[in-house]
């Protein structure tokens, strides 16, 4: 089993030293879901939501969040992201929104946390914009779908 990289021999949390690592192209994809009532989803899809374009706002929030991950999660490194993409899809047959994020860079550490943060904050933004209409929406699951690059190699969720 692998060891935790953020904990030293004394059990104290520290930011990992990546200064000796080689720069490689790294990419990560994550997804999140927001489950809601059909009426709430219809407000979003039809563009009739009183707060405006829910998907556009959630997309921008997710992108901004990816860029601020280092500021939100204490042991994450500040990264020079080269790409952040957030896609939102209404799945009307299941009364949910699927959010997929992609983050990419050429660097010394991975972008999994940035992708997860982007998807999570986009989901939270949908909740925030729709909570006046429905308070019992459910966010989840949120998960890493795939990551490439770096020493640990390629990871992909099995279908």
UniProtKB/Swiss-Prot annotation:
DNA-binding as a keyword of this entry, yes or no, is no
**Could you tell me which pathway this protein works in?**
Cofactor biosynthesis; molybdopterin biosynthesis
The record ties this protein, via CDD domains, to: MoaC_PE
Record carries keyword Lyase: yes
Binding annotation for substrate? 75-77, 113-114
Keywords on record: Lyase, Molybdenum cofactor biosynthesis
Q: Which GO terms describe its biological process?
A: Mo-molybdopterin cofactor biosynthetic process
A family per Pfam? MoaC
Enzyme Commission identifier(s): 4.6.1.17
Subunit annotation: Homohexamer; trimer of dimers.
Write down the PANTHER family for this protein, in alphabetical order.
MOLYBDENUM COFACTOR BIOSYNTHESIS PROTEIN 1 (PTHR22960:SF0), MOLYBDOPTERIN COFACTOR SYNTHESIS PROTEIN A (PTHR22960)
Q: What is this protein called?
A: Cyclic pyranopterin monophosphate synthase
**What does UniProt list as this organism's lineage?**
Bacteria, Pseudomonadati, Pseudomonadota, Gammaproteobacteria, Vibrionales
């Amino acid at each position: 089993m692998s060891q935790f990289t953020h904990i030293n021999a004394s059990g104290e949390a520290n930011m990992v030293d990546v200064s000796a690592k080689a720069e490689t192209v790294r990419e990560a994809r994550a997804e999140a879901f927001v489950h809601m009532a059909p009426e709430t989803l219809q407000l979003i899809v039809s563009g009739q939501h009183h707060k405006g374009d829910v998907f556009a706002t959630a997309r921008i929030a997710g992108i901004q969040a990816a860029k601020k991950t280092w500021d939100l999660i204490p042991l994450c490194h500040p990264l020079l992201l080269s790409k952040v993409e957030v896609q939102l899809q209404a799945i009307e047959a299941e009364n949910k929104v699927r959010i997929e994020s992609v983050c990419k860079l050429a660097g010394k550490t991975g972008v999994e946390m940035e992708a997860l943060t982007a998807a999570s904050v986009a989901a939270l933004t949908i909740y925030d914009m729709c909570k006046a209409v429905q308070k019992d929406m459910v966010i989840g699951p949120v998960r890493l779908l795939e990551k490439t690059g770096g020493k640990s190699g390629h990871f992909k969720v099995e279908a």
